[in-house]
Amino acid sequence: MGGCSSPAVSQQSSSVATVPSKPEETETTPPTETTQPTEATEPPRQWETGYVATLNLTAEYYDEEGNPLGTLTRGTQVEYEKLPDGRMQILTDGGIGYLREDAYIVSQVADVIPAHTRYVRTAVNLRDIDGNLLVTLADKGAAVTVTGCDDLREDGTAHMYRVDLGGREGYMMPWYLAESEADAVANYDSGSYAVHAGRGDRYGGGGAANLDYYPREKGPIAGNIMPEECRTLYVAAWRLNEVDAYLKIADNSGINAFVVDITDGGAVGYASDVMNAYCPSGAAAAGNTVEDYRAAIQKLKDAGYYVIGRITTFNDTYFVKDHPEYAITDPEGNPLKLNGEYWPTPFNRTVWQYKVDLAVEAVELMGFHEIQFDYVRFPDLTYKYEKAGTIDFHNAYGETKAQAIQRFLMYAADILHEHGVYVSADVFGECAYNYVTAYGQYWPAISNVVDAISGMPYPDHFSASGTWLPWEHPYDTLYSWGKSAMARQGETATPAVVRTWIQAYNAIRDPYNTYGSDEITAQIKGLQDAGCTGGFLTWNAASSVDKYTSLMPAFGPADTTEAQ
């Protein structure tokens, strides 16, 4: 994780008078004693090298008469000499200058930021110098002492602040801190905070008021262009040996992106070093070698497609098998099987670290353009356990479910953006409505953090209304859902792109409608008409080549003019 190297200015050598040879001593001519040094006898000046330290981003310097000569960016490397009167004399392009009193020189970049107090604006865990999570959570409003940084960017800003929180040391990203306590404890109000404040904890996922809505820095990543509309084909990892068949479909239709499993619950894409370290059981179940998986992804990229790597986050039976201590358990500490699966608890930071490390490794090994986190939630249908007191989520920090989910995504986005990739999150279709769900997903809070948000409003997952069956009305169902999703988009400061999963399989409910190209077209049009214009992803669990081939007319014509 490092930041940019410290900036430097050009340096010029000091002009030092030449010391003449010492006169020869003779018996008749004793050496002359000199009580005061002169220019001829003064030793050469010893300039030291250091870095400009100041609380500001720049430091001014002056000539002997106090006239301003210019400014230096914090962290600039200079040659300097500390004078007896306390002034700091430096060498610059223009010659000798003197730093203003609010700046000084230190021996290492890590110390260029003077100690001062800041306040936690957004609750986050401290990190180590490599960006890995520490157990200490810095709560909103807490005072920390900034004692330095890990590195500087070219403009003198810190990559991470080195901080002390009540004797516990670590690092924090600067944007999670405020200069005053009042600013730190205030809630960001984009005109809709009162809306969030009125949405309490209805179903056990937490309230909306204590989530974070501060604007996040998003936008194009240099060298990585996300298509404005991702028309995306889903490919299960175990089908990558058929990559040529999927390319044929994409090349002859409007598809311009692929989403490929890195992990999908019990289906593991490849056995990586990170997985071997954290989850050897999962690595042993891998369906591809690293080399074969990478070759398939590279083939998609070489053909000009935007490629997304999908990770199932908090649904991981293999990880629980290897680490039952990180599981959601019964009161006796035994991993609890929920909906047929074992779940690591989303409250645990080791679980977070594993998933983010796995994502970073996937970017480095495979060159994905984006990482998508699916199952980024708590298990659903746990109300009966919670009511009976027969479930333990091991909530070490006293967080709500929604806080844990949003904070995980904040950490993941911070890390992955520095690796040059986008971050997306999958959410249940229910998440588009105006409450915090029981499993901790709240659309405005998640959309504010990630680059793309992908709801899963499959028509056959909606309840029937009398004789009206949503899966028989794909346009109306997705249009109505899309309007709700866009309403949530307007409730957050920096909303994500809305890129939606669509049903690309036959309905699983009576009368078991066949979903052909007309039904796919209807879903896509319903979303677009509702304002959800970021694209779609096809959900077909088997990634059936035959099914996708039959749906090609819905994907539109191949765009030979679009730069993919």
Task: Annotate each predicted stretch with a short phrase.
Residues 243-268, 363-370, 452, 527-535:
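Catalytic domains of carbohydrate-active enzymes, especially glycoside hydrolases
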Residues 221-238, 295-298, 309-361:
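Active-site-adjacent "subsite" loops/lids of carbohydrate-active enzymes
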Residues 450-464, 473-479, 484-564:
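Substrate-binding cleft of secreted/luminal carbohydrate-active enzymes
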Residues 253-288, 380-388, 548:
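Aromatic-lined carbohydrate-binding/catalytic grooves of carbohydrate-active enzymes
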Residues 40-86, 119-158, 197:
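Beta-loop motif signature
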Residues 234, 306-316, 372-379, 399-439, ...:
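Aromatic-lined carbohydrate-recognition surfaces of secreted/lumenal glycan-active proteins
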Residues 239-243, 248-253, 299, 342-376, ...:
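An active-site-proximal structural segment forming one wall of the substrate-binding cleft
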